[in-house]
Amino acid sequence: MIAIETRQLAGGVVLHAFPEGKRAVPLPCVVFYHGFTSSSLVYSYFAVALAQAGFRVVMPDAPEHGARFGGDSQGRIHRFWQILHQNMQEFTTLRAAIQAENWLLDGRLAVGGASMGGMTALGIMTRHREVKCGA
């Protein structure tokens, strides 16, 4: 069994999934990023599968996506690269918030994603040598 919730973290709303009963227990953690024009809620099946495997999962919405979507679909298309770059920049704050919550077991933090989220994960790995695993 797992638990899944939306909550405030690092100044924004994230989807947070974890094995049931382990909300406050340090676990290996995956920050998972969704694709362009999508949201963490649409990609929540990744959170379910990873939490069932024993991971803590944190899924933020990219700028102008999900809970952060302001309604400008046409403009968003023209801001793809800015959105991708901001997504990568926000990782530092998100990682610090995850550490402050004492959610990491032995510093085991991975990043992953699909589509634009995969590009985000790869970009984070090139800039954050402390991240040892990506998917």
Per-region residue spans from a language model:
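Surface-exposed, active-site-proximal loop segments in enzymatic domains
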Residues: 71-79
